[in-house]
């Protein structure tokens, strides 16, 4: 149990650090304070690899987004922090449907993965960010939903392409169970 705790803390710390670095240095602005964020593909990898501890995906996004907002903007948007965490959490919760640690990432696994990420993003950017920003910043609903929609779609595309590729590469690097036999 102790090793799992250490592994969880280390994975969360490394994941949050990668989240911040990628978010700050690799982003493509598209609308307001919204940009294409490639760190979500890496968050997916951590969320799935440590899926049985999906809390890693949550805290990687949560801590990473808090620190990124603080460093980059000097102000923290708690709704977007929660959205980043929820994205990692939901993807991790469904991780058994697309367990890449066994060396397989089939078409059906890819479909499950993208359905899970769509659900996570729908909750995060369809509900949490517009309502949270309305409470925190009192902005117009039309702006909030437009910004959340753009971010959700951009993140879906990023995760669908980048996340799927990272998971496929990771799966191909793992030994499939039963693939080693006596010759």
Swiss-Prot record:
Keywords: Cell membrane, Membrane, Transmembrane, Transmembrane helix
Subcellular location, record wording: Cell membrane
Record-annotated membrane-spanning stretches: 11-31, 44-64, 74-94, 111-131, 149-169
One Gene Ontology term, aspect cellular component: plasma membrane
Gene3D superfamilies: 1.10.1760.20
Coiled-coil features, chain-numbered ranges: none
Top-level division of the source organism's lineage: Bacteria
Protein's membrane topology: Multi-pass membrane protein
Main location per the UniProt record: membrane
InterPro entries: ECF_substrate-spec-like, UPF0397
Family annotation (HAMAP family): UPF0397 (MF_01572)
Family under the similarity heading: Belongs to the UPF0397 family.
PANTHER family xrefs: UPF0397 PROTEIN BC_2624-RELATED (PTHR37815), UPF0397 PROTEIN SPR0429 (PTHR37815:SF3)
Protein name: UPF0397 protein stu0306/stu0307
Species this chain originates from: Streptococcus thermophilus (strain ATCC BAA-250 / LMG 18311)
């Amino acid at each position: 149990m102790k090793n799992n705790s250490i592994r969880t803390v280390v994975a969360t710390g490394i994941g949050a650090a990668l989240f911040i670095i990628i978010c700050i240095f690799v982003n493509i602005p598209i609308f307001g304070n919204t940009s294409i964020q490639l760190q979500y593909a890496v968050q997916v990898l951590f969320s799935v690899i440590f899926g049985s501890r999906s809390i890693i995906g949550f805290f990687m996004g949560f801590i990473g987004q808090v620190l990124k907002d603080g460093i980059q903007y000097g102000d923290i948007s708690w709704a977007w922090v929660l959205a980043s965490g929820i994205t990692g959490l939901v993807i991790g919760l469904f991780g058994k449907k697309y367990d890449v640690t066994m060396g397989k990432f089939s078409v059906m696994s890819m479909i499950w993965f993208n359905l899970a990420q769509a659900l996570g993003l729908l909750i995060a950017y369809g509900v949490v960010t517009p309502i949270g920003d309305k409470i925190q910043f009192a902005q117009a609903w039309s702006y909030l939903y437009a910004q959340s929609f753009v971010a959700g779609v951009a993140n879906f595309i990023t995760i669908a392409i980048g996340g799927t590729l990272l998971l496929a590469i990771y799966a191909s690097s793992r030994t499939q169970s039963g693939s080693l036999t006596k010759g």
